[in-house]
């Protein structure tokens, strides 16, 4: 072998091992590290039965099939009626959502607002917060149903002055039989494990948009077009030196048919790129090294994973003459074949996690590539280039 060929082999080997190590760390090493640290350094939240004034905020867009049930769910939650207000907004819906909100408002069940044109979730949330009178703001997706005692459980965490954000549990109700929802549920069980581990340290990155609450004074106006605010809002609170925690007693569930789909994953990936663009421009990260470490490990590595996958696969293919890399290439090929088999609904249903896990992993990362392509071509970005100052992130001094 020529010296040049040896150098190419060395570079290919480095690409493989660095890529494989980062993928393994991002999806296995980091969650286990958070789990171990959470057990060692866990300081329980000081919960108590408190009843501050609470505002439950529900933005909705074309949720006509579920909005009436959502409103009934909200008004029947166990919380003193004189301490709870429910605010629901229709964001330019073209179905029966607006009419249902108007009916509920006229009946005195909620405070509602119906926008004639779509303005985006961030703009609607800004308006709802402006209308709200509660000391605690609780956000909930229109498509989710909240268990009756969840508000009381959520609010009890705010008895601890260290806590600024509390997330409830997100539960996906499996209602289809094609395996797609099963793959989504598998992912959410994994993600819940990661967030619970982070929460034991008081540093949970992101909350479940299905149900989470914050202290009112910690809400900063969102730039119109902001995506994935259920990640950005908790991070702003963490940067101010307050805790973001998890409460398994507060539960919100959603029909799996509302959640599955490749286009939805593309939208979430675009939101993740937006988060990164916003947060990495914020000053003060060096004063929050632990939070920066979590951001890099939990979020940045996830965004890099599609490229790490391609690099690892290509480098092992280049080094195919070596027995060790031949095994690695074969293992990756089998994994990708399993993912392709998962495209078939019958095989996905019968294969269980053996098919569902590779299928969902590859789907999520393929969505990340499509999302980045759209960003580069500037198609369908909405407010992807929101100004970083709009979130008013202030690092703790």
Give the role of each language-model region:
Residues 2-50:
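N-terminal membrane-anchoring/stem segments of glycan-assembly enzymes
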Residues 83-87, 98-131, 182-189, 193:
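Conserved donor nucleotide-binding strand/loop of the catalytic core
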Residues 33-53, 260, 280-292, 333-397:
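Juxtamembrane C-terminal module of membrane proteins
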Residues 73, 90-99, 117, 144:
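A conserved acidic beta->alpha catalytic loop
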Residues 72-83:
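Short, acidic, metal-binding catalytic loop of nucleotide-sugar glycosyltransferases
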């Amino acid at each position: 072998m020529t010296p040049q060929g040896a150098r190419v082999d060395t570079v290919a080997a480095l690409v493989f091992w660095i890529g494989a190590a980062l993928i393994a760390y991002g999806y296995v090493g980091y969650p286990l590290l958070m789990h171990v640290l959470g057990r060692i350094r866990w300081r329980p939240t000081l919960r108590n039965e408190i009843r501050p004034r609470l505002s439950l905020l529900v933005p909705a867009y074309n949720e006509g099939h579920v909005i009436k049930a959502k409103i009934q769910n909200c008004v029947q939650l166990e919380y003193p009626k004189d301490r709870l207000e429910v605010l629901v907004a229709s964001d330019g819906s073209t179905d029966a959502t607006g009419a249902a909100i108007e009916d509920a408002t006229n009946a005195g069940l909620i405070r509602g607002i119906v926008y004639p044109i779509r303005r985006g979730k961030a703009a609607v949330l800004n308006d709802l917060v402006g209308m709200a009178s509660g000391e605690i703001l609780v956000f909930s997706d229109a498509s989710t149903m909240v268990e009756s005692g969840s508000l009381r459980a959520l609010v009890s965490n705010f008895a601890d002055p260290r806590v600024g954000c509390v997330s409830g549990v997100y539960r996906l109700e499996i209602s289809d039989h094609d395996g797609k929802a099963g793959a989504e549920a598998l992912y959410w069980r994994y993600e819940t494990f990661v967030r619970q581990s982070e929460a034991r340290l008081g540093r949970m990155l992101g909350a479940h948009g299905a149900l989470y609450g914050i202290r009112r004074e910690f809400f900063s106006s969102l730039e119109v077009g902001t995506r994935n605010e259920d990640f950005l809002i908790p991070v702003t609170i963490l940067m101010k030196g307050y805790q973001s925690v998890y409460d398994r007693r507060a539960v919100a569930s959603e029909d799996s048919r509302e959640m599955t789909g490749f286009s939805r994953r593309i939208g979430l990936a675009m939101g993740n790129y937006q988060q990164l663009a916003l947060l990495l421009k914020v000053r003060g990260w060096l004063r929050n090294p632990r939070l920066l470490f979590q951001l890099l490990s939990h979020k940045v590595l996830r965004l890099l994973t599609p490229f790490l996958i391609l690099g690892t696969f290509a480098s092992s293919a280049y080094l195919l003459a070596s027995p060790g890399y031949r095994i690695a290439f074969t293992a990756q090929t089998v994994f990708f074949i399993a993912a392709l088999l998962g495209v078939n609904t019958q095989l996905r249903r019968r294969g269980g996690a053996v098919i569902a896990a590779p299928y969902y992993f590859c789907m999520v990362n393929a969505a990340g590539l499509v999302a980045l392509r759209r960003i580069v071509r500037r198609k369908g970005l909405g407010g992807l280039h929101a100004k970083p100052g709009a979130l008013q992130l202030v690092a703790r001094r």
